[in-house]
Every structure is written in structure tokens, then in C-alpha cells.
């Protein structure tokens, strides 16, 4: 046995209503979703494949997905934090280099964060991207979290992931990536786009809507 810590997930029932599988089967399903990104031509997977190609080592996501729910052995509450604690010595035992270890542990700790952001916040608000950029820190961690969230959700139940959720998820990803790339320049870019949109609407002279209302 290479990962004795995984034993506690075997046949572990997850009582949240959206979970259809035991923790061990869910983990394997999530890994299978990552395989599909590489091997299938399903349109929804193409942007995730592109994001993977931009990562330093896309194979690390297999390890991250394998370990992301390992903390559930100690209970669902706080399982992200307990997962980090359990995974840390395991990664050291496997000889994973420090930089890669840090990346894997970051995603384990924050593997629920991205979905919560786009579920609870306006992804079109620049402040949402700014706040998420502050959380993820850099593009490498963002790309890994972006793909991981997709695989994790589809590994729970493919039917739970629809085009609406995918649009919100990808909108947050792209806005955050832009924020990380341009920094404070994003605010100026957003304001410029806003002004251009306002000018276009004013030029159309929409019946019953004044220029002041548009502005």
C-alpha cells in the first residue's frame, strides 16, 4: 500500500445531498474527468485542456485530485484544512519537490473556494476578480484550481455541471487571469470599456431612456 491514508475513504458515505458516490469512488471519478480533458473532444473540455497546457506540470493535478478529499477521513467539516495536514507528510514521503508540494497543498486547501466565489459573487464585478486574484496569488495556482474545480464537480455528478455554471466558472477564471497579468491596469481597462458601452447606448437614442439614465 502506497497511500495508507486513503484507506479511511474506502466506502465512506458522503451525506451531502449532491454526492452520489462514496468518497473513494468520487475521487476516482474526478481523476477520470481529468483523463477526459486529455482524451476526449467534448467541446466543454477544450478550454480546460488549453489551461493545462499553460501549467508547468499538468501531471501534478492527478496527485492533487487523488488527495483533495483525504481530510474527509476526519469529517466533512474543515476537511480542506485537515487534508493539508494529512497530505503534507505524504508528499514529503513521495519525494515531491517543495515548489510542487506547495502547489498541491494550495489547491487542496482551497479546492472549494473558486465555486463559492462564482456562486456568491458577481463575476462581472472587477472587485470579484481582484479579491480572487489576491487569494490565488499567481497564474499557476489559478490554472490548477480552475481545472481541479471542474474535475471535482463533474466527479461528484456530471449532471450537476451545466453550461451556466461553466460560464460563471470560466468568466471568473479569465477575469482573474487578466487581473494577475495587468494588475491595477484592469480597473482602467474596465472603466474604458464601460465608457465606450455608455457612449454606444447614448448614440442609439433608445426610446424612453435618457442619456443621464444610461450614464
Residue ranges and their predicted role:
Residues 30, 83, 108:
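Divalent metal-coordination and catalytic microenvironments
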Amino acid at each position: 500500500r502506497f497511500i495508507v491514508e486513503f484507506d479511511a475513504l474506502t466506502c465512506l458515505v458522503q451525506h451531502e445531498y449532491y454526492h452520489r458516490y462514496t468518497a473513494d469512488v468520487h475521487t476516482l471519478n474526478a481523476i477520470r474527468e481529468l483523463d477526459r480533458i486529455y482524451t476526449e473532444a467534448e467541446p466543454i473540455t477544450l478550454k480546460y485542456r488549453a489551461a493545462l497546457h499553460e501549467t508547468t506540470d499538468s501531471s501534478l493535478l492527478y496527485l492533487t485530485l487523488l488527495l483533495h478529499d483525504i481530510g474527509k477521513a476526519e469529517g466533512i467539516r474543515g476537511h480542506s484544512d485537515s487534508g493539508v495536514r494529512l497530505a503534507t507528510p505524504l508528499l514529503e514521503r513521495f519525494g515531491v519537490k517543495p515548489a510542487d508540494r506547495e502547489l498541491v497543498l494550495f489547491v487542496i486547501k482551497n479546492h472549494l473556494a473558486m465555486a463559492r466565489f462564482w456562486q456568491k459573487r458577481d463575476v462581472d464585478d472587477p472587485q470579484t476578480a481582484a479579491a480572487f486574484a489576491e487569494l490565488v496569488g499567481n497564474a499557476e495556482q489559478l490554472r490548477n484550481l480552475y481545472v481541479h474545480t471542474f474535475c471535482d464537480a463533474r466527479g461528484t455528478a456530471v449532471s450537476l455541471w451545466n453550461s451556466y455554471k461553466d460560464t460563471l466558472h470560466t468568466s471568473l477564471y479569465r477575469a482573474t487571469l487578466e487581473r494577475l497579468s495587468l494588475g491595477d491596469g484592469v480597473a482602467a481597462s474596465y472603466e474604458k470599456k464601460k465608457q465606450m458601452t455608455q457612449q454606444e447606448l447614448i448614440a442609439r437614442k433608445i426610446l424612453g431612456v435618457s442619456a443621464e439614465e444610461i450614464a
